Every structure is written in structure tokens, then in C-alpha cells.
Amino acid sequence: MSVSAFNRRWAAVILEALTRHGVRHICIAPGSRSTPLTLAAAENSAFIHHTHFDERGLGHLALGLAKVSKQPVAVIVTSGTAVANLYPALIEAGLTGEKLILLTADRPPELIDCGANQAIRQPGMFASHPTHSISLPRPTQDIPARWLVSTIDHALGTLHAGGVHINCPFAEPLYGEMDDTGLSWQQRLGDWWQDDKPWLREAPSLESEKQRDWFFWRQKRGVVVAGRMSAEEGKKVALWAQTLGWPLIGDVLSQTGQPLPCADLWLGNAKATSELQQAQIVVQLGSSLTGKRLLQWQASCEPEEYWIVDDIEGRLDPAHHRGRRLIANIADWLELHPAEKRQPWCVEIPRLAEQAMQAVIARRDAFGEAQLAHRISDYLPEQGQLFVGNSLVVRLIDALSQLPAGYPVYSNRGASGIDGLLSTAAGVQRASGKPTLAIVGDLSALYDLNALALLRQVSAPLVLIVVNNNGGQIFSLLPTPQSERERFYLMPQNVHFEHAAAMFELKYHRPQNWQELETAFADAWRTPTTTVIEMVVNDTDGAQTLQQLQAQVSHL
């Protein structure tokens, strides 16, 4: 009997089972212990293969692929700390709803806790973060193939969001020629190999339930808060709120067109919050709200009812309102709860939103990151998409810009870390094939710098804007101790990215004014390559501009 041959047959069943659940993209890191999985994936023509040498980046690449494809994405890594590097992407997927399937190769049980090389305790290492965890046994013909395939099917068939961890121990030898070992074991699955359906079919129910008193609440004074959702959902939510005559407070990830722009400015005005106090119901569609003042208002508002609609399970209200947590697809829920045409009940807020936008426009000429955030909609590629980083950049865009309704926007706003942002953007571009504008800060770019390797091969133009304000200037907005701020919070690195771009043979521009930036964009959108645009700005100007605008609008 050939151990290596049976390892591969065992792995082939696992990989084939994944295809029955919509897995098309598979991300593979180099490793020896994962050889059976890697070779099985390579031999399966149903997969689109992606490779990367950094497992942390690989996990985020898979995350980006899953964001756009809306399908589960598989990841293969070897044993040891390679597995631990998948933790950040798994955590993010659990919070934002992407489906990841982590296939982690492992040493067999007799090599654990005995000093064997690259052997750690992998079963259960992700604690409660996976939706489902499977610790497979060492491959053996004593276990029928139908057990293996039905075990995989059960985990994936009930997967609605988040990650599945499948730990796969393999004994040596890992290499060798294929023979007939295990062929009859495989063939006991019969015509399943020619079919395209799971062996065990389980359909998770996510049917929207109609709220029978909706006809009553839709006649009241309401507010719509729009969080993260798809582009199509964003357009539907905007129309729904407009028909109801309810003010819509749209997050940067809502893709609603933000009909009341600059919410994080005007929510600091007492006239706005006073008017919002008249709301009898708040309906929040989508989660992951960005703006600080929106979150402050959301925490303090006390309507008669607060409804949260999202297809992600679990609690999504840190303010613990009295109301309803409705687990449903947003578009389906809107269809079950049609709007009734009514006149807008808010008078002050539309006026304040317009005045706030005019205040932002009055400052748009200076060459800075706040102004870039405001202008970002001018630079979006046609039929393209936007990927927004975390920290200061997403807050500036949320507060100062007005993105087009239905324009795809992606970000990692679950745990809101700055790790893996470039890798995630690479996955977003690969899955869609669309022109992509990605914008991150300098520390975020440094954190995931080796992901520039993933940007060498793109199917459409990709522009990566690195806003270099020399450190984590988000901390300039926080009451961090002045004497310790630079050393322990901002951590300026005094670097530029020209040589990083050159290392990976990417085009690079460092514009000094708006005209040079626009010229760089015009050049970048012409060819299906990656262009790095480094925008060097004064360290604290962006944070200061935001603070000044917030103060100005609060006194309108």
C-alpha cells in the first residue's frame, strides 16, 4: 500500500466535495505537509488557482475574492505557524460574512507534543471564530469515503457566513508515484464523481419574515441608517427611504449615494440631533458603521423601535436598543416591506447636509488627504470599483465625500484592522476583473508591503493610492497624550514607496498637485497594470481639516 497515493485520493475527495458547494477560487501557499491537498487542487479543473508565499496575505486574498464572488473560497496551507497566519482573515470573515474554507495540513497525532518539527496543536486553535471546525483523522481506508464527503458536506451545507476550519493530518511519505492504492475506496462513491451535487444536501434557511405591523410603522416618523451592503441593495435602500420620506444616513460602504452627505459633520449640529429625536422608529439596514458621530447618535437615540436588518447572524447593536434583530437578506426584506409614498418629515437636516457639503467644497483646492477624500468620486474608474482602507482614510471619505449610488465599494470594516488591506484589494480585483481604485495609508501599505507581489498580475487597471502622512494620524483625532503621541502612537517611519514599487516592477507616480495626480490617473487607466500613486501630504493637515469642518458645521 502506498501512503502517498492514498493521501492524495483522500485529499481528492475533500477537494471535489468543495466544488459541489460553489468553491471556484482556491488559494495555495507553499508547503510540504500540504502536498496531498495542493496536488489534488492542481488536478481539479474546476478551480481557479491563486498562490502567495505569505499565509497572512493569502488569507486576505481569499477574503477579497469571497467579498466579490459571494461564494466560499478555499485556502490551503501547511502545518505550524502557517496556520496561525490565517487568523486575521478568519476573524474578519466572521464579522463581515464572507465564506472561507481553511484546509490546514497537519502532522499525524503521534508527532504532536513530542518535539517533532513544525508540529503544533492545530485542532481548535481558532477557538470560537470558525462557524464550523472539523478535525479529520489520519487518512485510512478503514473509514468509508462516504463518511468523509458527508462530513465536509454537513459543514459547508450549513455555512451561511464566516469560516470553516478543516484540519487535515497526513503521514509521510508525502511524495511518490500514483498507483491503485485506494482506488476502490474512492470508487465506492459511485456516480457522485460524475455528478455536480453534494453527497449530503442541507439548505440553510434564510427566509425573510414579514413584520405584520409594518403597515403601522411605515406611517410614522422614521430614520433609515444604511451600513455595509451590496451595490444593488444600496440603490434599493435609497429609493425605499426616499419613498417613505425618511432621512437616510448612509455609511461610506452603503452604496446608497448618501443623499444626505457629510453626515459625520452635520450630526455634530444640535439642530440635526434635535430633529432626529422626533423619530419614532429607526431602521438600520446593514452593519459596520464608520462615522464616530453616527455611532454616537446611534448609541444615544431612543426611538420607540430600533430595527436592525442584516443577513449576518448575531448581535449587531453595541447600544443594545429595544427593538428587533431581523436576520434577512436586505433586498428580500425590502420587498416584503414596501414603502408607502409620504412627504419628508425632516426639514433642517437636508439644509444642514447641503451647507456641510458647501463647507467641504470651499476647502477642496489645497493638495491634501482631506481634499482627496472629498474628490475621490472624481477619480473612480468607469464600470469599476473602490477599495477603501481603514484608520483615517475611511473616516475622511465617509465624512467628506459623496459616492455614486450603486458604485461598488469594498473594505475590511469588521475588525477594522490595517493588516492585509493590499492583499484583500488584490482579491477584490481578481474576482471581479474590474478596474479598481484602492486607497490606504502609509502604515497600512507598510504592514502588507509584500502583497505588492500579488498586484503584478491584474486583469484590469488597478491604482493603489498610498496617502503618506508619515504615521498613524488617526491618533491625532484622539486625546492621546501629547508628549507620547509621536513615539508611541503615530510612529512615523519617514519612508517613501518608490523603491517598493520598483522592486515589484509596478508603475509609480508621486504627484505634487492635482493636475499631476489627474495626469497619473489618466495614464494608469489606459493599461491593465498596477500603478502606485504615493500622495505625500503634511502630517496632521487631514485630521485638522476634519476637526475644523466638524467645528464649523456644528455652529451652522
From Swiss-Prot:
Pathway the protein takes part in: Quinol/quinone metabolism; 1,4-dihydroxy-2-naphthoate biosynthesis; 1,4-dihydroxy-2-naphthoate from chorismate: step 2/7; Quinol/quinone metabolism; menaquinone biosynthesis
Q: Which UniProt keywords apply?
A: Magnesium, Manganese, Menaquinone biosynthesis, Metal-binding, Thiamine pyrophosphate, Transferase
Which InterPro entries does the protein's record reference?
MenaQ_synth_MenD, MenD_middle, THDP-binding, Thiamin_PyroP_enz_TPP-bd_dom, TPP_enzyme_TPP-bd
The Swiss-Prot or TrEMBL record annotates one GO molecular function as: magnesium ion binding
Q: Which CDD domains match?
A: TPP_PYR_MenD, TPP_SHCHC_synthase
A single Gene Ontology biological process assigned to it is:
menaquinone biosynthetic process
**Cofactor(s) needed for function:** Mg(2+); Mn(2+); thiamine diphosphate
Domain of life, per lineage = Bacteria
Q: EC number(s) on record?
A: 2.2.1.9
- Give yes or no: UniProt keyword Manganese: yes
- Going by the record, the broad EC class of this enzyme is transferase
Quaternary context: Homodimer.
Role this protein plays: Catalyzes the thiamine diphosphate-dependent decarboxylation of 2-oxoglutarate and the subsequent addition of the resulting succinic semialdehyde-thiamine pyrophosphate anion to isochorismate to yield 2-succinyl-5-enolpyruvyl-6-hydroxy-3-cyclohexene-1-carboxylate (SEPHCHC).
Protein name per its UniProtKB record: 2-succinyl-5-enolpyruvyl-6-hydroxy-3-cyclohexene-1-carboxylate synthase
- Provide the species name: Shigella boydii serotype 18 (strain CDC 3083-94 / BS512)
Q: Report which gene this protein is encoded by.
A: menD
